[in-house]
Amino acid sequence: MFRFFSMLVLGDTARFNRFAERLQLAEQTTVGNPVVDLDLVTPDGTRCQLADIVKAHEGKTLLIDFWASWCGICRMSTPDIKTLYDSIDRSQFEVISVSCDEDDSAWREAMKEDKMPWTQYCLTPEGYKAFFLHYQTIGVPYYLLVNPEGKVIGNPGGVEQVEAMVKKELER
C-alpha cells in the first residue's frame, strides 16, 4: 500500500496507471461478475469462445479447470475431479477443462492418458495471453467456479475447496 501512495506522491503516473489498469483487469474476474471471455479451440480444431460455452451451461453450476499436460499437480488432481463429477447429477453440475498447453500434441496425449469424461478445450495463443492477464494467475491448476446464472462464484485453491464450494452452491 505504501508503494501505491508513493507512486501518487512522487508523481510516477506511468507506474500508477499500469497499477490501476491491473486492478481494473483483476476486478473483472471477481466474484459476481461474468466470466472474462477467452479464445479457445476444441480437440477437432474448431475455435470457440469461453463466454459461449458458459452460456451453453446456464442453469448448471460449472467448474472450469485450467490445467496443462506438464503440470503434475493438475494431472494428480484429475481423479478427484472425476470423483466429484461422477457424484453429481449432470442436470446440476458440469465440468469443462481448458488446457494451457502450447504444444498441441502434448495436450492431446494427456487427454488420452487421463481419460477425462468432460469436454476439453485448449487456449489459443491469444486466449493464453488473455488468461494470464485477466485472471492474474501465475500458473495452473486454476479452478473457476461459475453459478447457474453464469457469474463467477470463486476460484478455489484446490480440489477440496472446489468440492466444498460446489456442494454449497448446489444447496442454495
Predicted regions located by residue number:
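Short pre-active-site segment immediately N-terminal to redox-active cysteine/selenocysteine motifs
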Residues: H57-L62, F66-W70, G139
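Thiol/disulfide oxidoreductase modules built on the thioredoxin-like
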Residues: M116, L123-E169
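Conserved segment of the thioredoxin-like fold in thiol-based oxidoreductases
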Residues: D86-Y128, L133, T137-V140
